[in-house]
Regions:
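Enzymes that bind and transform nitrogen-containing heteroaromatic metabolites
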Residues: 1-191
Length: 191
């Protein structure tokens, strides 16, 4: 069972900042070719997902008892999803097999809970960037896919802060796409 941080977070080249949106919005899965290959690798073999409260909802979502996420009645996960939050809430069962569970846990504790629910499949760390950084810093990620987008934002959450030397533990490969993005994969060495 592997831990995958298969993100679709846009990372800018100037600072490694993220804006939380897909670089290929309007083109789900990209326009074909290499983007499509990476998009097709996103879901197979995933048995559970971990995400941060910021990915689950807008600031203050925890104050709205009717908020069920931004994905509508049939979210795209189709697995148990563990939302890391300090705001306890009962689990929410959605169409298509997605159940949101709200937990206040360390990365190690959250991963243990997600692995139990994953039924011997991989666990995906879905984001946001702070959650991904926490799992990377704890040495819990086996594989990560990040998309570098050729835009300058000048704002956003910095993904790489505090992760100096990360490349020593991973085989890093970059694949450029005709769409202008670069897919960067990190595969843990020695696993």
């Amino acid at each position: 069972v592997k831990v995958r941080a298969t993100t679709h977070i846009s990372v800018t080249p100037e600072t490694g900042c993220t804006n939380g949106c897909s670089p290929l919005s309007g083109q789900p899965g990209g326009s074909g070719g290499v983007d499509d290959v990476f998009a097709r690798q996103h879901d197979p073999g995933i048995g559970a997902e971990i995400m941060g409260a910021g990915k689950f909802g807008h600031p203050g979502w925890h104050e709205d008892p009717n908020w069920q996420g931004a994905w509508g009645p049939n979210p795209p996960f189709h697995t148990p999803v563990f939302v890391l939050t300090h705001h306890h809430r009962p689990s929410i069962e959605m169409e298509g097999g997605t159940t949101f569970h709200f937990i206040d846990a360390s990365p190690t504790e959250a991963l243990e809970t997600a692995r139990e629910a994953a039924d011997d499949q991989d666990v995906r760390i879905g984001g946001g960037p702070t959650i991904i950084r926490d799992f990377l810093a704890a040495g819990l990620v086996d594989y990560m896919h990040t998309v570098v987008v050729p835009i300058l934002l000048g704002r956003g959450v910095r993904l790489w802060d505090g992760l100096e030397g990360l490349e020593q533990d991973y085989k890093v490969e970059a694949t450029s796409s005709p769409t202008g993005v670069t897919h960067v994969t990190f595969t843990r060495t020695g696993t």
